[in-house]
Amino acid sequence: MVIKYLNKKGQEFEIDCGKDEILLQAGLRNGVVLPYECSTGTCGSCKALAKPGTVNVNEKDLDGFKNVKISKGEFLLCQGTAKENCKILLNTNLSKSNKDEQLPFHQIAYLKDFKEVARETITANFYLSGKISFKAGQYIIVKHPSVEGYRAYSMTNFEENSDLLSLVIKNKINGKLTNYLFDSKDDEIKFDIFGPIGKATFNPLEKKNLLMIAGGTGIAGLMSILNHADQLRYFEDYKVDL
């Protein structure tokens, strides 16, 4: 299917989209810079507008849908899929990714090396079928057949052109995926993953002191930033407050 992202400023980009492909993922993998933060339906940052009936809204009991007026054609890019060729209106600037940036893509990965490091907290590694380069602070979204929808996990390591991603995973009360992982007896678990994505990243060329606060996004992304900074000996010249 052909999808056209556009805004009222006249900026527009046309891409090919797969059947049942999530519209945010389709745009990002084709290099279109789209509005998003969580990519999983929590924040509502990717709200868009399409002609009613052209998009499967896939409404769920998620916080991101609270201010979405579905009857008027609004939906979330991170949940919606196209029914047919369609136009998607966005209330934001549109542009293409820099040529040197790693575009996100789908691949199969195996989660292994489970190790308990604290109560209800484990570390584990994703072994990828293809290598990726990611910025410190970025994340991936993962999908397992036993759980509906995607879940986001930030990497704790930093390595360019890597086929291994390290995670910290906390078992959440009523967390369907984490409950499954903590109950599983398997040595490895197969996932579909999409990434790298995320805009809250570390750029050492900015040459600034760092203030790092772990909130709703957790500590994992900050660990990746610290790893990258340590590799560069960044803190020999700049300060960090945690």
Regions found by a protein language model. Name each.
Residues 1-34:
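N-terminal pre-ligand scaffold of iron-sulfur
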Residues 13, 34, 39, 130, ...:
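Short, conserved secondary-structure segments in the cores of folded domains
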Residues 16, 37, 69, 81, ...:
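Residue-level "contact hotspot" at macromolecular interaction interfaces
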Residues 22, 26-35, 45-94:
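Iron-sulfur (Fe-S) cluster-binding segments and ferredoxin-like electron-carrier domains
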Residues 82, 94, 145-149, 195-200:
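Short, charged beta-turn/beta-strand-edge "cap" motif at the junction between a beta-strand
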Residues 99-190, 208:
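Ferredoxin-reductase
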Residues 162-163, 173-242:
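FNR/FR-type flavoprotein reductase catalytic core
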